Amino acid sequence: MKLHELKPAEGSRKVRNRVGRGTSSGNGKTSGRGQKGQKARSGVGLRPGFEGGQTPLFRRLPKRGFTNINAKEYTLVNLEQLNVFEDGTEVTPVVLKEAGIIRAEKSGVKVLGNGELTKKLTVKAAKFSKSAEAAITAKGGSIEVI
């Protein structure tokens, strides 16, 4: 390969479309804005959801639900992520954070049953799914709700 044989990657050098530069360019005269109207004028700034003065959809529909300020948000950990630990390890939220499996604890850690557990572990967490609980005890490990 020589310097003069180098070519840019396909599609990486797309030419900017210059509008309003003659009719034969394909984007002359109206510059791709169509004919007259609000959107053809300069400085147009229609906010998202604006329907030309008609009551917009988000105001025609009723409000629903609420945000529960007391809802607990758990950090989720799957069984397959626990395989990084040695047999007989006591897995706590602090240990999970040190191992880089979780970033922050939030309201606690919830262990879910996705994946397959191959080690015998003692897992301490705020919550366990039924499948995770069954998988941990099936491998001879134990769970503890903290």
Curated annotation (Swiss-Prot):
NCBIfam families per the UniProt record, alphabetical: rplO_bact
Similarity section: Belongs to the universal ribosomal protein uL15 family.
Biased composition (Basic and acidic residues): 1-13
Amino acid composition bias (Gly residues), ranges on this chain: 23-35
N-terminal signal peptide: none
This protein's name: Large ribosomal subunit protein uL15
Self-association state and partner proteins as the record states: Part of the 50S ribosomal subunit.
Region Disordered, residue ranges: 1-57
HAMAP family named among the record's database cross-references: Ribosomal_uL15
Pfam families named among the record's database cross-references: Ribosomal_L27A
A GO BP annotation: translation
InterPro entries with a match to the protein in the record: Ribosomal_uL15 (IPR030878), Ribosomal_uL15/eL18 (IPR021131), Ribosomal_uL15/eL18_sf (IPR036227), Ribosomal_uL15_bac-type (IPR005749), Ribosomal_uL15_CS (IPR001196)
Gene3D superfamilies: 3.100.10.10
Organism: Streptococcus thermophilus (strain ATCC BAA-250 / LMG 18311)
Function: Binds to the 23S rRNA.
Entry keyword annotation includes Ribonucleoprotein: yes
Keyword rRNA processing carried by entry: no
SUPFAM superfamilies: Ribosomal proteins L15p and L18e (SSF52080)
A GO molecular-function descriptor: rRNA binding
Alphabetic keyword roster: Ribonucleoprotein, Ribosomal protein, RNA-binding, rRNA-binding
Gene Ontology, cellular component aspect: cytosolic large ribosomal subunit
